[in-house]
């Protein structure tokens, strides 16, 4: 970059201002990254808990299903599953976590399986349907939590790349520019000082010469 800038005092001031801005920007991005990392690890715990809950309710639901099939006819089980088939709606909003847009999902209260169960369906089959409704809710929680986790993870990577670009490329480049400009300005100052000293020395020699000549003329007149 040094070859693309004019080594002037105004350029030096501009480079110093750019260095201050870049350094401040890197600090802000690092604070954001640290906050996101803290949020990420908190979400990891939530995601693991959601997965564990899903595994637990799934196991219970399949146990209920096997029991229902043992006590009720396959037709009864199938009829309840068809009766409970409908669109599953969730209340989803978008929230911002340190500038990252993530979904916030609220699961509405669902209708009990007994409310839409056909006639001649046993309690075990109704319980199985209820348990699988709980599984569906657990799946939604897992999806929401892992979506947050993925988006925050992507933002951490993006922020880290920006920090690295500032610290490894931009800031060193600006510092190189400042060193270059200072070097040129210092060299110019030394050259100017040397030139002024030569002029001063020349003027002093001429003055001494004039004084010497004046002294000679005075002696001759006497």
UniProtKB/Swiss-Prot annotation:
It comes from the Bacteria. Transmembrane segments: none annotated. Keywords: ATP synthesis, Hydrogen ion transport, Ion transport, Transport. GO terms for biological process: proton motive force-driven plasma membrane ATP synthesis. It holds the Pfam family ATP-synt_D. GO terms for molecular function: ATP binding; proton-transporting ATP synthase activity, rotational mechanism; proton-transporting ATPase activity, rotational mechanism. Coiled coil: none annotated. Produces ATP from ADP in the presence of a proton gradient across the membrane. Belongs to the V-ATPase D subunit family. This is V-type ATP synthase subunit D. The lineage of its organism: Bacteria, Thermotogati, Deinococcota, Deinococci, Deinococcales. The gene is atpD.
